[in-house]
């Protein structure tokens, strides 16, 4: 209940900041975005705090179903100057000093979703070899980004290969090079650990395997974003791979990256402490968020794992039953 909407809120904030609100709402009209539609909800409001700084935005619908910004405010220690009735955000181009800090925050998080692993999906397709500055949100430039690591940060690539081998025993190593037929394109080629005479590509990997390679690349990259949001990274992963995923997530957090993960995986939850977990429940037609209290669960955790407490409905985060 509401986990994906929480991630989608940050996507919407990014859309607003990047001045793509008009195009976004042409595909996602107000009737779909607003809580129970326009009859129930008249405005969509967001408020984010970053230390002494804050950002507020109020979206209102037009007659054609698109949205405009009814109010936008950047705050510093509670004071701010609102801008009203604009088509796109002013923050990105603002010359106001306080907005420099706000821009840094709004640019600091990246949202990733590696759900689509179908034939012809970005994760299984060739990539432009020059599209390699950062891993794209859908993993579409994965081979180009790995190739850049091979050339610029080979130790990182070796580390990624080592972790991938732990999750995919038949994986030997990557064989990354631009296509001899089109030097601007590159495929995700790899070799089998027991059969090195043939090269394979992303289409020879299972859905879970190609997702795991993307996740390992994301979490082990040398220059992590300040914040990463991932929606259900456990999809299609073997339990052993979920354990490795949890380890990489903790390692990324230790390197100063804030991770916001939505999950339905008991196995993934088992690798974390109560204070790491926020449950989402539906109450009175809306989603409510609550961080677990470790002291309140201390007695239970003597005999049960955190995941077991979840499945036994001892903690929140349960499906809504009618």
Regions found by a protein language model. Name each.
Residues 56, 60-77, 183-192, 284-293:
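Short, well-ordered strand-loop elements centered on a beta-strand within folded domains, enriched
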Residues 42-44, 53, 107-108, 273-276, ...:
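Short glycine-/polar-rich loops that comprise or flank the Walker A/P-loop
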Residues 7-66:
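Conserved P-loop NTP-binding catalytic core
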Residues 244-322:
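C-terminal lobe/lid and adjacent interdomain/linker elements of RecA-like ASCE P-loop ATPase modules
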Residues 158-220, 227-243:
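Conserved ABC ATPase signature
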Residues 1-28, 138, 207, 212-218, ...:
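Phosphate-binding glycine-rich loops of NTP-binding sites
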Residues 52-56, 197-199, 287:
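Short, mixed charged/polar active-site loops
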Residues 49-176:
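Electropositive, glycine-dotted interaction segments
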């Amino acid at each position: 209940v509401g986990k994906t909407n929480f991630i989608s809120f940050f996507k919407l904030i990014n859309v607003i900041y990047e001045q793509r609100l008009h195009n976004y709402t042409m595909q996602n009209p107000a009737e779909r975005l607003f809580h129970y539609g326009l009859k129930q909800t008249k405005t969509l409001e967001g408020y984010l705090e970053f230390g002494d700084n804050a950002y507020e935005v109020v979206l209102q619908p037009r007659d054609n179903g698109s949205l405009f910004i009814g109010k936008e405010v950047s705050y510093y220690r509670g004071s701010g100057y609102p801008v009203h009735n604009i088509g796109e955000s002013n923050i990105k181009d603002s010359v106001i000093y306080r907005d420099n800090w706000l821009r840094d925050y709004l640019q600091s998080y990246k949202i990733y979703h590696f759900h689509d692993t179908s034939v012809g999906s970005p994760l299984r397709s060739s990539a432009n070899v020059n599209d390699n500055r950062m891993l794209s949100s859908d993993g579409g430039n994965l081979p180009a980004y790995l190739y850049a690591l091979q050339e610029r940060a080979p130790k990182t690539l070796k580390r990624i290969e080592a972790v991938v081998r732990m999750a995919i025993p038949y994986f030997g190593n990557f064989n990354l090079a631009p296509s001899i037929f089109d030097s601007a394109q590159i495929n995700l080629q790899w070799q089998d650990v027991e059969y090195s005479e043939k090269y394979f590509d992303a289409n020879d990997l299972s859905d879970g395997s190609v997702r795991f390679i993307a996740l390992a690349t994301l979490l082990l990259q040398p220059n992590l974003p300040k914040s990463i949001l991932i929606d259900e990274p456990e999809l299609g992963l073997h339990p052993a791979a979920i354990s490795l995923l949890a380890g990489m997530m903790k390692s990324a957090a230790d390197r100063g990256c804030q991770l916001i993960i939505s999950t339905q995986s008991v196995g993934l939850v088992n690798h974390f402490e109560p204070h790491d977990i926020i449950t989402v429940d539906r109450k009175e037609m809306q989603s409510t968020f609550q961080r677990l209290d470790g002291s309140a669960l201390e007695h239970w955790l003597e005999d049960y794992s955190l995941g077991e407490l979840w499945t036994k409905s001892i903690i929140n985060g349960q499906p809504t039953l009618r």
